[in-house]
Amino acid sequence: MSDEEEYSEEEEEVPVDTKPRHSVIVVEEKGDPEFVKRQEQKSSALDEQLKEYIAEWRKQRAKEEEDLKKLKDKQSKRKVMRADEEKRMAERKKQEEERRVREIEEKKQRDIEEKRRRLEEAEKKRQAMMQALKEQKQQKGPNFTIQKKDPSFNMSSAQIERNKTKEQLEEEKKISLSFRIKPLEIENLNVDKLKVKATELWDAIVKLETEKYDLEERQKRQDYDLKELKERQKQQLRHKALKKGLDPEALTGKYPPKIQVASKYERRVDTRSYDDKKKLFEGGWATLSSESNEKVWKSKYELFANRSKSKLPKWFGERPGKKKGDPESPEEEEVKADAGVDDELEEPTFEPEPEPEPEEEAAEEEAEEEEEEEEEEEEEEEEE
């Protein structure tokens, strides 16, 4: 049920509610006049409220009808716009499908033409070969021709580019520029065509600049990759050389290292030079062993000769096996000291000393022990 039908039912119900009230008032008019008066006042107040409610309801209904009308208008406009959009989309899809079909047909046509061209070239080559064979049979000469060797036969394209002279490069540059740079031909063009020509040139400049930037970035990236790969290869070669017991820079040089001979029994890498190995086969093992023994004995002799030489105590007496530079014994020192003064004196005669008593002998022994300890301490201090 629509809103209009509901509203019409409410309008019909309102007067139905008011009729019994009037009938009640008519029935009660026969009673107390004051009561009747109050009832009339109440009925009039209710009628006014009802009228206000009806007026408010009609305003609200008119507003809702207006909003509903606006919504219906928007809906109809949206339907029209959607239909137009669907129509445009269908047209665009149709054009896209036609373009795709046309491209497929053009590609097929190009493939057919390319195949026909290859077949024609193959047929021409075959006919030329047959003609050459016929001429050869007629001439009855050698079936081959020796051509002069091109100097750039075994050279790569990069080597050929590097070996080109300056004049050749200039000539190639002129030829390439003549293909790329075309004449403008703007003599008989009006303003609109000149604008179109300017936009075309601007687009070409933008395209060339973008290609230039892309190539520069690609070159930077490739240079970085090459540096990284070279460094990685260098590190791997260093580790490989260290594993083989070689110098870390042995494998990174211009020439490869010499072949290392591994011991069959010890499973060790032989790091000796070629000359050392050659001496082994020439009977140099004895010389090597003698040289090593001489080095050992020489080092021991140097340690013995450079030892610290201490002075002997006076009670030691004469040193046996005295050599040049060794400290003299106490007797020799006293003899040298007295030699300069008492050379002309006669040798004195001494009387035998009396035998000492036991107490004196013990005291002398203690004194001698103390002197020995003092001399040992002095020698230790001198050595330090």
Curated annotation (Swiss-Prot):
GO terms for biological process: muscle contraction; regulation of muscle contraction; sarcomere organization. Troponin T is the tropomyosin-binding subunit of troponin, the thin filament regulatory complex which confers calcium-sensitivity to striated muscle actomyosin ATPase activity. Residues 1-23, 61-169, 237-257, 313-384 are annotated as: Disordered. InterPro entries: TNNT, Troponin, Troponin_sf. Residues 61-74, 81-126, 316-327 have a biased composition (Basic and acidic residues). This is Troponin T. Disulfide bonds: none annotated. Belongs to the troponin T family. One of its GO terms (molecular function) is tropomyosin binding. Keywords: Muscle protein. Pfam families: Troponin. Residues 1-15, 328-384 have a biased composition (Acidic residues). The keyword ATP-binding does not apply.
